[in-house]
Curated annotation (Swiss-Prot):
Species assigned in the record: Danio rerio
Biased composition (Polar residues): 1215-1226
Cellular component annotations (GO), alphabetically ordered: axoneme; ciliary basal body; cytoplasm; cytoplasmic vesicle; nucleus; trans-Golgi network
PROSITE patterns listed in its UniProt record: WD_REPEATS_1
Major localization class: cytoplasm
Protein name according to UniProt: WD repeat-containing protein 11
Range of residues in the leader sequence: none
Coiled coil residues, start to end: none
Ranges: WD repeats: 63-112, 115-158, 358-398, 476-515, 571-610, 713-750, 752-792, 798-836, 898-944
Region feature (Disordered): 1213-1239
UniProt-listed PANTHER family: WD REPEAT-CONTAINING PROTEIN 11 (PTHR14593:SF5)
Any single GO BP term: cilium assembly
Subcellular location: Cytoplasm, Cytoskeleton, Cilium basal body; Cytoplasm; Nucleus; Cytoplasm, Cytoskeleton, Cilium axoneme
Length: 1239
């Protein structure tokens, strides 16, 4: 360190970052929560990346020039490997029509897309990622949809529509379906594809405004049953005819979304109600209406894991509504029997606290965690981000009766498997582990199972991020880091705000360190007087005499204590213009607008001098960095040493004590450089209105006037001065800078042509002569040694914000406050503030495997998935044989350490099965494809294992407990799927309101085999209907069909003729009447109606026939033109074709998934052993071993190679040889040969 007494500045490494504030109205919809576990949020033209678990902003992306209007994380619905790694990819769109796809970790733009210059209305990544995982659909105003390749920025196709498009929603069950919400209604597209634009203009339907519905005109004092009945009358809201001009004012539908919890359902959101539509009938089957005094909706998010809705209301309250099961529970008294059967009811199950809404503070958007669906984040216009978590509490069974709601029960499974004895679990892991699935009458037992508890849901606020208040701001960085204060230094930035508070940020973390309410009006300036205290001043609005109330406060950060520095002074006087503290923090100058300046002693708080009335008006002022502290210290030291020598010394021991006393004195002296006993001489210079420079010396309480320098003719009125070493710089109102070299007695004027020089500041650090200059239209950095500009930013040229204040925060970083409400820490080059996330110093570690290098992320996954080579499961990466750089090992260990204790204890629990582990890890990684696969695989491996064990019937209630939820649609068990479809038709039937609807219901009933009910509907056709005769005959036919040969063959002949002549649906119906549903399915498949055929097979065919139909469908899904292999695999899993799935996984090179799947199948005994299977096992295990070797996990490689039998022998030899010679091939060399198929 420095040997001299005077400390010199050392540099501290701070990350470039942006502290953000209030949002712009255009940012309202710019927020998204990705499968990757992070939240992206638009703030003016920047994008914040927030980790919801630790409530930290971990990245800010800056490249947009206009306000960000949409952000969307890419989907993770594909198998991840070294070539398709886990990566943080985000698309953002702005108000000028630009879309940027980001690599979030590096903060770099991956590609930029521009089609038009109007704000992007909506945008989303395609969820089906088998063909490509890079496709992005965007709505370019007014009426275009464009499909982009988000990796290259290439336009694939563009399509225009007749009306203005407001937003769109993809069908989560069918990638070829898309619905557009337009200014006039809805357009349904059924031929969406990445290869070509939709062929037709889509099917248009118009929404009749729900305000004409009885829900809004019900009498105020109606009984609840009456209100419920009124809701039932909201029948049709969808018509194919365009409504008359007076009926359509403006489409006040706020949102349209497909329900991910059940196929072919959609919600429409209006301010006062949510309509649930069944799209097969274009019919309302449920309404969530707000009572007259209730708070209107802004937004709704439908869940996938349960039929539930998260709703955001105008007061910032988030409510969770869960669809009521249609099976009445045994102890439930049905108050309104009609209601129970007539529509879907969404019960309010939980709500969080509202916020205080004002003109400037209102809720903007809510997003929920897509992986677990049990956390919601609310974004408020003032920049606050509130994280609410849903918690389930088991309760006494009687408590629900008071609310009048049927009880909610807990889930039976944890990670897809019933809990074992003493098994650790996380009840709040996800929505489907908190509450059980919705019950289906006739399939599920209405009574809860033995281990199901009644639960209540509550929202808990678990995180809060708050932004800066509204600008303007004044900034001041604390004194710089020096060799003296290095041990206790914190890089603190004080931000004075318009409401009188001072926010102190720690720039290492970017987090708010203290918020102090100091003043009653806007803070005008701040000056630090030590590392832990500062002076700040504020001035009130002038009265009619032009006088104000001045507030000058002394603030101690350690205690939070504030006091008025000028005592009673301050009322009714001219405004303070500036305050300047001397270099050694001994003296303070206070400059007023129309009043002579005051000179104060900072240490004692006493007024040293109030200048005379004739004192010149000050336009700019700066303290000199030179002083006589050094020579004073030398004199003092000499005096002390003289005293010490006069003392007689008893022995040498005493002298050592004495010298330590002296050094203590010196230490004390240097620690308080401005200690009371010593007053060093300091100087300041100032200019008057004529540009004359004055020099004043202050020592103790004596003030001396020094030399005066006449004005420089080339300069205008001087606005600011900066002084460092031998360089003095003056800036004027005309944009001139004048550089004085005091040693060489030279001056040099430079016109910047940028107008008024508002502020100039020298950078800290010994010999650092960089100067930061602020103008009305931007800022520049100058090198005063070379007298040349280093960097520049200008409004309208390279930034779109105005700069309000400037300072240096380290010797090479500047901090700027701007009118978009942000404070930016930038490199000296003043370029974008995005940074590499892996170089950041975070206060709390963040769990996000996507931040790791691709190879390291896969290692972490393999490490968590299975450690069969260990006796116990460890969370310490150093305990396994892992060849990798220590730095990468360290990063992996940081990820492991950042997991919550709950998750760690579950992962280390010996009772956790392989299937549960695979499911849990896919949740932790936010791996959509893995989660889908393991949910279905785990369910059917266990189901087939169970039925193999007990060929006798499955015990009652057991099957019901474990069926897949209806969000898996055709993958569900047939009995459950059938029950759901019957229930659905019953709802449709109650809701029908026209002949069209009745006909559709009768058709569905015939396909489902419900002939009696169908006949009743057919006979309802009125005599004046053109179909009266036809329907009557059909009713007769249905009732008289016998199983006699001749009638069957006649009907079959008629049916096949009908199909051949283009009447497919009618022919299929006839075939179903004579129990020839298998033939019907074949015809449907021949004519390309694959999904309809699968549906019919599930509801009508026995297991063997149904299996044939579904296998053909799976083959079709694998064909190159369809390319939905991942869906085909799920279909095969539901049929128990485990060998086929194992072979597919292996041939698609999903080596990790293949090995773990085959291992699970062998464990549960659902793969019999034969030569083919042994060959598959060997190939899969050896390829997984090679993959593990390539990422450096040698122990794992040995384990799987040894499990591979003959196939693994060669690899085992290679592995033992590398062990013997001690040379391990580097992962990079090994990658290629690890991907060779072993057959």
């Amino acid at each position: 360190m420095a040997s001299t007494m005077i400390p010199y500045t050392v540099n501290i490494k701070l990350a470039a970052r942006t502290l953000t504030g209030t949002l712009n109205l255009q940012n309202k919809t710019a927020v998204d929560w990705g499968w990757q576990g992070l939240i992206a949020q638009g703030c003016h033209s920047s994008i914040l990346i927030i980790d919801p678990n630790t409530a930290q902003t971990i990245q800010v992306l800056e490249r947009h020039k206009a306000n960000v209007v949409k952000v969307k994380w890419s989907r993770e619905n594909y198998h991840h490997s070294l070539s398709s790694p886990y990566s943080l990819r985000l698309a953002s769109a702005d108000a000028a029509g630009k879309i940027i796809v980001w690599d979030v970790v590096s903060g770099m733009a991956h590609c930029e897309i521009q089609e038009h210059s109007k704000p992007i209305q909506d945008m989303d990544w395609l969820w089906a990622q088998d063909a490509s995982r890079d496709l992005l659909l965007a709505v370019h105003p007014p009426n275009y949809i464009v499909l982009w390749n988000g990796d290259t920025g290439t336009k694939l196709w563009k399509k225009s529509y007749a009306e203005n498009i407001l937003s769109f929603s993809f069908d989560p069950f069918e990638p070829s379906n898309l619905a557009l919400l337009t200014s006039e209604g809805i357009v349904f597209i059924t031929d969406f594809s990445h290869s070509k634009p939709p062929g037709s203009g889509g099917k248009k339907v118009y929404i009749a405004s729900p305000h004409s519905s009885p829900a809004h005109s019900k009498p105020a004092a109606a009984q609840p049953t009456g209100a419920k009945k009124a809701l039932n009358k909201v029948k049709v809201l969808i018509t194919n005819e365009k409504p008359t001009a007076e009926a359509v004012t403006l489409n006040d539908c706020l949102q349209l979304s497909y329900l991910p919890s059940k196929r072919n359902h959609m919600l429409l959101l209006y301010p006062r109600e949510i309509l649930i539509l069944d799209l097969e009938l274009s019919q309302t089957v449920g309404v969530v209406a707000i009572e007259r005094s209730g708070v209107p909706f802004i937004q709704v998010i439908p869940c996938a894991q349960r039929d539930a809705l998260y709703c955001l209301h105008e007061n910032g309250c988030i409510t969770l509504r869960v669809c009521r099961s249609t099976t009445p529970s045994p102890n439930e008294t049905v108050t309104d029997p009609e209601q129970n059967s007539q529509e879907l009811v969404y019960d309010l199950r939980s709500q969080c606290d509202a916020i205080r809404v004002t003109k400037t503070v209102r809720p903007y958007r809510v997003v929920i965690c897509p992986v677990n669906e049990n956390k919601a984040v609310l974004v408020v216009s003032d920049g606050r981000v509130m994280l609410w978590e849903l918690k389930a509490h088991a309760s006494k069974s009687s408590s629900n009766l008071s609310s009048g709601l049927p009880p909610l029960y807990s889930a039976v499974n944890f990670c897809g498997t019933p809990l074992r004895q003493n098994q650790k679990c996380i009840p709040d892991l996800s929505l489907n582990s908190m509450i059980g699935h919705s019950l289906i009458p006739g399939v599920d037992s209405p009574r809860p199972l033995a281990d199901q508890k009644e639960v209540h849901l509550k929202f808990l606020l678990t995180g809060l991020l708050s932004g800066l208040p509204l600008p303007p701001f004044s900034l001041r960085m604390c004194p710089p880091l020096t060799t003296k204060n290095i041990n206790h230094y914190q890089p603190l930035l004080a931000v004075g705000t318009s409401n009188g508070s001072v926010l102190v940020y720690n720039l290492t973390s970017g987090l708010l360190h203290k918020e102090l309410s100091v003043h009653s009006c806007e803070v005008r300036g701040i000056e630090w007087i030590s590392l832990t205290s500062f002076l700040s001043f504020a001035t009130s609005v002038p009265n009619n005499l032009g006088l104000v109330r001045n507030e000058l406060q002394h603030v101690d950060l350690r205690t939070g204590r504030c006091f008025a520095f000028r005592g009673e002074r301050g009322n009714d006087e001219p405004a303070i213009e500036m305050i300047k503290v001397s270099h050694l923090k001994q003296y303070l100058v206070v400059v007023f607008r129309d009043k002579p300046l005051e000179l104060w002693d900072v240490r004692t708080g006493t007024l040293l001098r109030e200048m005379a009335k004739n004192f010149p008006t000050v336009t700019a002022l700066e303290w000199s960095p030179s002083h006589n502290l050094k020579s004073l210290k030398k004199k003092q030291l000499a005096a002390r040493e003289a005293m010490a020598r006069q003392t007689t010394l008893a022995d040498a021991e005493q002298s050592s004590v004495e010298s330590s006393v002296i050094s203590l004195l010196q230490d004390a002296e240097s620690k308080s450089e401005s200690s009371q006993g010593i007053s060093a001489r300091e100087h300041f210079v100032f200019t008057d209105t004529d540009g004359q420079v004055y020099h004043i010396t202050v020592e103790g309480n004596t003030v001396k006037d020094g030399a005066r320098i006449p004005p420089d003719g080339s300069m205008g009125s001087i606005a600011c001065i900066a002084w460092k070493g031998d360089t003095l710089v003056l800036g004027d109102v005309d944009g001139n800078l004048n550089f004085w070299d005091l040693k060489a007695r030279l001056s040099r004027g430079v016109p910047t042509h940028r107008g008024w020089v508002k502020k100039i500041r020298f950078a800290p650090g010994k010999g650092n002569q960089k100067l930061l200059v602020m103008y009305t239209d931007g800022a520049e950095v100058w090198d005063t040694k070379e007298v040349q500009m280093v960097s520049s930013i200008r409004v309208g040229r390279n930034v779109n914000y105005r700069i309000l204040d400037i300072d240096w925060c380290t010797s090479d970083k500047v901090v700027l406050a701007s009118d978009d409400g942000c404070v930016r820490v930038l490199e000296m080059a003043m370029k974008s503030a995005s940074y590499r996330m892996d170089e950041q110093d975070l206060t709390d570690p963040v769990w996000c495997p996507y931040l790791l290098l691709p190879r390291a992320a896969l290692t972490l996954k393999a490490f968590l998935l299975l450690q069969p080579w260990m006796d116990t499961f460890t969370m310490d990466i150093t305990q396994v044989d892992y060849k990798e750089k220590d730095e990468i090992k360290g990063l992996i260990q940081e990820q492991l350490n950042s997991l919550s204790n709950d998750i760690k204890s579950v992962l280390q629990d010996p009772n956790l099965s392989l299937l549960q582990r695979c499911l849990l890890v896919s949740r932790l990684f936010g791996d959509e494809s893995d989660l889908q696969f393991w949910t279905v695989a785990s369910h059917y491996i266990q189901a087939f294992a169970q039925s193999a064990q007990s060929n006798e019937s499955v015990p009652e209630g057991q099957a019901a407990a474990s069926h897949l939820d209806i969000c898996h649609d055709i993958l569900c068990e047939s009995s459950f799927f059938q029950g759901f479809q019957l229930e659905r038709v019953r709802l449709q039937e109650v809701k029908r309101s026209s002949y069209e609807h009745t006909k559709k219901c009768a058709d569905q009933l015939l396909l489902l085999g419900q002939t009696d009910r169908a006949v009743q509907l057919l006979l309802e056709t009125s005599a004046d209907n053109s179909s009266y005769y036809c329907d009557s005959l059909k009713a007769c036919l249905v009732t008289t069909i016998t199983s006699s040969g001749p009638s069957q063959s006649t009907i079959k002949l008629v049916a096949t003729n009908m199909i051949a002549n283009g009447k497919l649906a009618e022919g299929v119906q006839l075939l179903c009447l004579i129990d020839k549903a298998a033939d019907a399915c074949r015809y449907l498949q021949t004519y390309g109606e694959w999904t309809r055929a699968a549906w019919l097979a599930k509801v009508r065919l026995n297991a063997a026939e149904g299996s044939d139909v579904l296998k053909r469908w799976a083959e079709h899904l694998c064909s190159p033109q369809v390319n939905q292999k991942s869906k085909a695999m799920l279909v095969l899993l539901s049929l128990g074709c485990f060998q086929k799935v194992g072979e597919m996984l292996h041939s698609m090179r999903y080596f990790d998934r293949a090995a773990l799947f085959i291992e699970a199948c062998l464990k549960y005994g659902v793969m019999e052993t034969n030569d083919d299977i042994n060959k598959l096992v060997g190939a899969a295990f050896v390829d997984y071993a090679k993959l593990l070797r390539s990422i450096g996990l040698k122990q794992g490689a040995v384990h799987w190679a040894s499990r591979a039998g003959e196939a693994g022998k060669q690899l085992l030899e290679d592995l033992s040889q590398t062990e013997g010679t001690g040379t391990e091939s580097s992962p990079a060399d090994d990658t290629d040969n690890s991907l060779v198929n072993i057959e």
